[in-house]
From Swiss-Prot:
Family statement drawn from the similarity comment of this UniProt entry: Belongs to the QueC family.
Residues that coordinate or bind ATP: F14, S15, G16, G17, Q18, D19, S20, A21, T22, C23, L24
Gene Ontology MF annotations: ATP binding; ligase activity, forming carbon-nitrogen bonds; zinc ion binding
Cofactor: Zn(2+)
Reaction equations catalysed: 7-carboxy-7-deazaguanine + NH4(+) + ATP = 7-cyano-7-deazaguanine + ADP + phosphate + H2O + H(+)
HAMAP family cross-referenced by the UniProt entry: QueC
Cofactor detail note: Binds 1 zinc ion per subunit.
Organism: Rhodopseudomonas palustris (strain TIE-1)
Function: Catalyzes the ATP-dependent conversion of 7-carboxy-7-deazaguanine (CDG) to 7-cyano-7-deazaguanine (preQ(0)).
Name assigned to this protein: 7-cyano-7-deazaguanine synthase
Length: 237
């Protein structure tokens, strides 16, 4: 479960969702110490931030090694992002596909802003490794999730901070089924069950409906991707 090859600290973008929880486990297997950062940007699914605390408690319960490695959990509030965005994640509007081929859940610049804030915090704390759950395999087409975007931002951050920043994206080329499998490989059934029960993906913040893959409305793009991945993972496809 654990690789002690690194004596460094990593900062994980940890929203409380499936992908970021899996990335947290990935980081705990590779770094000597791991801190987490989450963002309150006025999202409709603010419930995800409440899930973070339960997930962190769950990680500590799964492994004493993980418990020892987990460091500070940071939460930053960025209200301006909702003020300048007109999307289904920050407004009470129906989720729909836009004329540009992107769903209206796309929050322009969100990951760019998150990674800039994460890098600024990491700089203050002497951290040069940042881990995020961006992926361009099973995703909604968001341009700020693409590998070329992340690589360009890594270069910009390294230049702007005058130190070598590494942006790790362990899910970039994994589909959702492979993401479930990665959780299994890293933490066994205990981690898979924790992610099913206590992570949150649904864009609408629905926690009343329980499915095999966890909680959610079952209809939004995030729920559909998570459900499809679970079915493929569980059936061994």
């Amino acid at each position: 479960m654990t690789d002690h090859s690194s004596d460094k600290t990593a900062l994980v973008l940890f929203s409380g969702g499936q992908d970021s929880a899996t990335c947290l486990a990935w980081a705990l297997a590779r770094f000597a110490r791991v801190e987490t950062i989450g963002f309150d940007y006025g999202q409709r699914h603010l419930i995800e931030l409440e899930c973070r605390a339960r997930l962190l408690d769950g990680f500590r319960a799964i492994s004493d090694d993980w418990a020892a490695k987990l460091g500070d959990n940071h939460t930053l509030t960025i209200p301006t992002l909702a003020e300048i965005s007109d999307t289904a994640l920050t407004r009470d509007v129906a989720i729909a596909m836009g004329a540009d081929g992107l769903p209206n859940t796309f929050v322009p610049g969100r990951n760019l802003i998150f990674l800039n804030f994460a890098a600024a915090l990491a700089y203050r704390r002497g951290i040069t490794d940042i881990v995020g759950g961006m992926c361009e395999t099973d995703y909604s087409g968001y341009p700020d999730c693409r590998n070329d975007t992340i690589q360009a931002l890594q270069t910009a951050l390294s230049l702007g901070m005058a130190r070598d920043i590494t942006l790790h994206t362990p899910l970039m080329w994994r589909d959702k089924a492979a993401t479930w499998q990665l959780a299994q490989d890293l933490g066994g059934d205990a981690l898979v069950d924790l992610i099913r029960e206590d992570s949150h993906t649904c864009y609408l913040g629905e926690r009343g409906a329980r499915h095999d893959w966890g909680y959610g409305c079952g209809e939004c793009p995030a729920c559909r991707l998570r459900s499809k991945g679970w079915i493929e993972y569980a059936s061994g496809i």
